[in-house]
UniProtKB/Swiss-Prot annotation:
Domain of life: Bacteria
Matching HAMAP family: Ribosomal_uL3_B (MF_01325_B)
Gene label: rplC
Protein name listed in UniProt: Large ribosomal subunit protein uL3
Keywords: Ribonucleoprotein, Ribosomal protein, RNA-binding, rRNA-binding
GO terms, molecular function: rRNA binding; structural constituent of ribosome
Any one cellular-component term (Gene Ontology): cytosolic large ribosomal subunit
Region ranges (Disordered): 122-157
Membrane-spanning parts: none
Assembly and binders: Part of the 50S ribosomal subunit. Forms a cluster with proteins L14 and L19.
Biological role stated in the UniProt entry: One of the primary rRNA binding proteins, it binds directly near the 3'-end of the 23S rRNA, where it nucleates assembly of the 50S subunit.
Similarity remark: Belongs to the universal ribosomal protein uL3 family.
Annotated GO biological process: translation
InterPro entries for the chain: Ribosomal_uL3, Ribosomal_uL3_bac/org-type, Ribosomal_uL3_CS, Transl_B-barrel_sf
């Protein structure tokens, strides 16, 4: 199992293939990530590596975290994430992981935080239909019935209603890597990924490959 990498969403653009067909892509600035911890089955019960990303000033982190990063001679890093692997012996503390761990045509899963849209109604949040807009109707965007009467005498848990929309962890699976720019540590991924430009992304090899 190959490990993943952390990156920052830069935005969307389009590129053209050999046939002149436009392909919408998201440009992601990935890494370089520093290996800050190596876990093995003998000592931790499972094999994994922890990587750090996003250099910041040391005063932005607390002392325990700075001490943890010092063990790998890593600078002050904002984000830490652990990736499971079949064998952690292939990695060493302080090793850099860059965009070249992926190749063009590879399928990846992209994990990020969706854009927060604040308090939203049922039409926008849950894709509900609306009521009549004329002929004296007073039920334009109302939610309608939310349950029965005296029995059960309550609203069932999980009932879809108005509330905060977005700002949650989202995984988009099996996106294709169109191009890898190893010199500038850029990935061009086909389609859209969660979040707004500047948001943090985790990119891992696709877990479910096939139809």
């Amino acid at each position: 199992m190959s490990v993943g990498i952390l990156g920052t969403k830069l935005g969307m653009t389009q590129i053209f293939d050999e046939a002149g067909v436009a392909i919408p892509v998201t440009v992601v600035q990935v890494g370089p990530c520093v290996v800050t911890q190596v876990k093995s089955k003998q000592t931790d019960g499972y094999a994994a590596i922890q990587v750090g990303y996003g250099e910041v000033k040391p005063k932005a982190l607390n002392r325990p975290l700075l001490g943890h990063l010092a063990k790998s001679s890593a600078p002050a890093l904002r984000h830490l994430k652990e990736y499971h692997t079949d064998s952690s012996s292939d990695y060493a503390l302080g090793q850099e992981i860059k965009a070249d761990i992926f190749s063009a045509g590879e399928l990846v899963d992209v994990i990020g935080t969706s854009i927060g849209r604040g308090f939203a109604g049922n039409q926008k949040r849950n894709n509900f239909g609306r009521g009549p807009m004329s002929h004296g109707s007073k039920n334009h965007r109302a939610p309608g019935s939310i349950g029965a009467g005296t029995t059960p005498g309550r609203v069932y848990p999980g009932k879809r209603m108005a509330g905060r929309l977005g700002g949650t962890r989202v995984t988009i699976r099996k996106l294709t890597v169109i191009r890898v720019d190893a010199e500038r540590n850029l990935l061009l991924i086909k389609g859209a990924v969660p979040g707004k430009p500047g948001s943090l992304l985790s990119i891992v090899p696709a877990k479910k490959v096939g139809k």
